[in-house]
């Protein structure tokens, strides 16, 4: 079997990792061994936070809906229960956007919910 010299593949692998570590501080962007660890850790953080982002945004939407519904005299839980009873199938993302951007439309929904709760 012929001898395999791995300089080309090693350099390519090192270059790939160092390119991913571009912008990191100090030796984290210059030294392969340290850059490799930094890139691995960055990947772990990215993986974790892609999942965490969903939780954070849902909490933000709930906070916004709660604030807007309290302006109309309803708590979040009563408002959401009223939506279910009124068969209004809007998700929290859309409701939160309405509460911030389109107050009259949100007020109309709140009025429908209030009518449904009273009945």
Curated annotation (Swiss-Prot):
Question: Which CDD domains has this protein been placed in?
Answer: Ribosomal_L20
Q: Does the keyword Lyase apply?
A: no
Annotated GO CC locations: ribonucleoprotein complex; ribosome
* GO MF term set: rRNA binding; structural constituent of ribosome
Keywords (A to Z) from UniProt: Ribonucleoprotein, Ribosomal protein, RNA-binding, rRNA-binding
Q: Extract the Pfam families matched here.
A: Ribosomal_L20
- Biological processes, Gene Ontology terms: ribosomal large subunit assembly; translation
SUPFAM superfamilies reported in the protein's UniProt record:
Ribosomal protein L20
Keyword Transcription regulation assigned: no
Which family does the similarity line name?
Answer: Belongs to the bacterial ribosomal protein bL20 family.
Q: So what does this one do?
A: Binds directly to 23S ribosomal RNA and is necessary for the in vitro assembly process of the 50S ribosomal subunit. It is not involved in the protein synthesizing functions of that subunit.
* Protein name (record): Large ribosomal subunit protein bL20
Q: Which organism is it from?
A: Janthinobacterium sp. (strain Marseille) (Minibacterium massiliensis)
Q: What is the lineage of its organism?
A: Bacteria, Pseudomonadati, Pseudomonadota, Betaproteobacteria, Burkholderiales
As recorded in Swiss-Prot or TrEMBL, the protein's gene is named rplT
